[in-house]
UniProtKB/Swiss-Prot annotation:
Keywords: Cytoplasm, FAD, Flavoprotein, NAD, tRNA processing. PROSITE patterns: GIDA_1, GIDA_2. GO terms for biological process: tRNA methylation; tRNA wobble uridine modification. FAD binds at residues 13-18, 125, 180, 370. Homodimer. Heterotetramer of two MnmE and two MnmG subunits. Its cofactor is FAD. NAD-binding protein involved in the addition of a carboxymethylaminomethyl (cmnm) group at the wobble position (U34) of certain tRNAs, forming tRNA-cmnm(5)s(2)U34. It comes from the Bacteria. It is found in: Cytoplasm. The lineage of its organism: Bacteria, Pseudomonadati, Pseudomonadota, Gammaproteobacteria, Alteromonadales. SUPFAM superfamilies: FAD/NAD(P)-binding domain. One of its GO terms (molecular function) is flavin adenine dinucleotide binding. Its main location: cytoplasm. This is tRNA uridine 5-carboxymethylaminomethyl modification enzyme MnmG.
């Protein structure tokens, strides 16, 4: 049975990747269908109730700069906002928000329901329709066929998902949801490498059974940050505190005593878990010298008693979970309302993807999110937006686009995945980016919004707001550069008390701001120098561009050198055995990875600069030198 309408893009899955993919394709004018097994769980925060953090917040800002929904939903759902690394340089500062699960889900669903060109339909997908190595549609569990020349798969942890609690296990996509078994079997028939990964979640605790007086209160920041460039503090709901407590030796003894019934340590779980978000049993095993581990007690919302104890993800048996929870200070009488569990699921080797996130073997089929081996809402959302956008571009007969590593953390994420692959759930950190001084949270819109507008991702309201901000920054920078103060100026006696060394020669306002003891708001408050910019985000941008101009210029010069060969394309059908001078190891790795560009090839482990030089000479001789899109 065929559905009565044909679509341009079909998105399978309604999590963070799927929602951003569907919204992106629809914003670009493509007739888009979002299929999900349950409309009520669209935008569900399946694990921790938080958005952002180190590296992750940078991705959220980039999604937002390209017109995505994640940051906007966070501003409407965030019940505590903090700027992490606030005392450090701007490159590593990151916004993190504790979110009300229900409010976040409601806002995402509201955005989806009001997006033109987007249809939503409740059905799980069991099969792909592939003809001559091109996807042409999908078939749902009730046999209903939907047709489209582009399909984006965002299946999360649902592909052959298996939930583990102690030595008991059962099939599931997440707690309370069925897995995607038929679709997983269908995907395993495709010529794409497949593996198993695992992730986990902690038990949820009844807040009424916690003694918060025995814990350390953690309040949000004042003034309140916002997540979206279109956001406003007035969008935030009521703000509340989180709390901090710790495990202890008794906790660790309880965990050690239960390891014989742990699915991880008894060989039941085969999948590899996230290195940077380990289970509590993994922490006790790997860091046996530590006598305690920090636990963040995080509310799941304003109208629920459920608490998320961040730091004790576990798949131990329920009786062990209860005992370990009750061994922690402040939780001696705690009651568990949902047990913690681990989930194992299929993922597909992202080296089998182009940097557009289209599979190399099936035209029109795109993967995004945990199916590519990543972990985290933010990583999923970023991939979803990129995959949905490129699916729409393909249908419209346009070239695919992916930002370079020096342009966005999204570019770092996709390049790492498609070039290096991953054997464990991949999460983003600022340390993964070579050019992080240029890839800051604060300038994500300056880096990406103009490109988003060109691609059709950015609407008129966002574009008007961005253009106004950009103009105000440029005018203020011009003012600071063009206005000067002389040693005999009447402003000097007013200014000197604020300086470490008095004015002895003429200086521009820009030079004054560059002094380490001066900041923009302080300078603008001095008579004769203001009033300056009222928009705090624009003012911050002016300060950073002035203070870090030398460092930024040097990093830009490094980028210009690196980019020369970065986008030199490599034919996907190139047999590296035919390239004289390459070692057998290099040939094997290049034939296995099939990099799309010289830049990707250079980042494969074991590919030497000499091998890259040989490749460039070969391409030039054969007339194959070309720039990738």
């Amino acid at each position: 049975m065929h559905f009565h309408e044909r679509f341009d893009v079909i998105v399978v899955g309604g999590g963070h990747a799927g929602t951003e993919a569907a919204l992106a394709a629809a914003r670009m004018g493509s007739k888009t269908l979002l299929l999900t097994h349950n409309l009520d769980t669209l935008g569900q925060m399946s694990c921790n109730p938080a958005i952002g953090g180190i590296g992750k917040g940078h991705l959220v800002k980039e999604i937002d700069a390209l017109g995505g929904a994640m940051a906007i939903a966070t501003d409407y759902a965030g019940i505590q906002f903090r700027t992490l690394n606030s005392s450090k340089g701007p490159a590593v500062r990151a916004t993190r928000a504790q979110a009300d699960r229900a409010l976040y889900r409601q806002k995402i669903q509201n955005i989806l329901q009001n997006q033109p060109n987007l249809r939503i339909f409740q059905q799980a997908v069991d099969d792909l329709v592939v003809e001559n190595d091109r996807v042409v549609g999908v078939i749902t569990q009730m046999g209903l066929a939907f047709e489209a020349p582009a399909v984006v798969l965002t299946a999360g942890t649902f592909l052959s998902g298996k939930i583990h609690i102690g030595l008991e296990n059962y099939s599931g996509g997440r707690a309370g949801d069925p897995p995607s078994i038929a679709l997983a079997h269908r995907l395993r028939e495709l010529p794409i490498r497949v593996g198993r990964l695992k992730t986990g979640t902690p038990p949820r605790i009844d807040a009424n059974t916690i003694d918060f007086t025995q814990m350390t209160e953690q309040k949000g920041d004042t003034p309140l940050p916002v997540m979206s460039f279109m956001g406003d503090v007035s969008h935030h709901p009521k703000q509340i505190s989180c709390w901090i407590t710790h495990t202890n030796e008794k906790t660790h003894d309880i965990i050690r005593g239960g390891l014989d019934r742990s699915p991880m340590y008894s060989g039941v779980i085969e999948g590899i878990g996230p290195r940077y978000c380990p289970s509590i049993e993994d922490k006790i095993h790997r860091f046996s010298d530590k006598s305690s581990h920090q636990i963040f007690i995080e509310p799941e919302g304003l109208n629920t008693n459920e608490i998320y104890p961040n730091g004790i993800s576990t798949s131990l048996p329920f009786d062990v979970q209860l005992n370990l929870v009750r061994s922690i200070q402040g939780m001696e009488n705690a009651e568990i309302v949902r047990p913690g569990y681990a989930i194992e699921y299929d993922y597909f080797d992202p080296r089998d993807l182009k940097n557009s996130l289209e599979t190399k073997t099936i035209n029109g089929l795109f993967f995004a999110g945990q199916i590519n081996g990543t972990t985290g809402y933010e990583e999923a959302g970023a991939q979803g937006l990129l995959a949905g956008m490129n699916a729409a571009l393909q249908v419209q007969g346009k070239e695919a686009w992916c930002p370079r590593r020096d342009e966005a953390y999204i570019g770092v994420l996709v390049d790492d995945l498609s070039t290096l692959g991953t054997k464990e759930p991949y999460r983003m950190f600022t340390s993964r980016a070579e050019y992080r001084l240029l890839l800051r949270e604060d300038n994500a819109d300056l880096r990406l919004t103009a490109k988003g507008r060109e691609l059709g991702l950015v609407d008129d309201a966002r574009w008007a707001s961005f253009s106004e901000k950009l103009e105000s920054i440029e005018l203020e920078l011009q003012r600071l550069r063009s206005q000067w103060i002389h040693p005999n100026s009447p402003l000097v006696p007013v200014l000197n008390p604020h300086l470490n060394t008095p004015i002895s020669r003429e200086a521009s306002f820009e030079e004054l701001l560059r002094r380490p003891e001066m900041d923009y708001s302080k300078l603008m408050q001095i008579e004769g120098f203001g009033p300056g910019l009222a928009d705090p985000l624009a003012a911050e941008q002016v300060q950073i561009q002035v203070k870090y101009s030398g460092y930024i210029q040097r990093q830009q010069e490094e980028i210009n050198k690196a980019v020369r060969n970065e986008n030199t394309g490599l034919p996907l059908n190139l047999d590296y055995k035919e390239v004289p001078g390459l070692s057998n190891e290099v040939i094997a790795k290049l034939n296995s990875h099939k990099p799309e560009t010289i830049g990707q090839a250079s980042r494969i482990s074991g590919i030497t600069p000499a091998a890259i030089s040989i490749l460039l000479v070969h391409l030039k001789k054969r007339g194959l030198l070309r720039k990738s899109a």
